[in-house]
Amino acid sequence: MQRPAFPVNEIARLKDLLSHEILDTNPDEFLDSVTHLAQNVFHVKTVLISLIDADRQWFKSRQGLDASETPRDISFCGHVILQNDIFEISDALEDQRFADNPLVTGNPLIRFYVGIPIKSALGSNLGTLCLIDDHPRKLTQEERAFLVDFKNIIQTYIINQHQNKTFQLIMDSVH
């Protein structure tokens, strides 16, 4: 199993993530609606919005998975935040990086995985939108375009929420 490396900007990325004050927060109805829609559009077992903390990936929204987090060192999403594009594994059992990963050999029995980074306004990869299934497959070009659209919706929402909180803090300090 290949453990994900740390991004070169890891300290700044974590600082940016923590500034969003989104880790370990209550479920968000809007984000849950988006992941539920994605689950139906892509016909996959699991859809997650995963935020990559120092030693774990925490799921802000999840469809088809009971766990609220998993260790970062076995995460697929930890690999995604190292790049800026779609990361797709058509069959994890056939990929040497993941074939013996406990998320492949045990529950949730990942075979298909695709993730795309979710960025902050500063450009940090905070986490991912990912699709998971228990059988091999490959996204079509149309599905890849839809995945980018879903990511953009989520990313814009997270950025707007953060900017609204920042604005409110400024307004509160003025009054």
Enumerate the predicted regions with their spans.
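Glycine-rich acetyl-CoA-binding "A-motif" of GNAT/NAT acetyltransferases
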Residues: 125
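Amphipathic alpha-helical "output/dimerization" segments
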Residues: 139-156
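Regulatory sensory and allosteric helical modules in signal-transduction proteins
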Residues: 46, 52, 56-62, 67-111
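Intrinsically disordered, low-complexity terminal regulatory regions
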Residues: 1-71
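Signal-transducing coiled-coil/dimerization helices and immediately adjacent hinge/linker segments
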Residues: 163-175
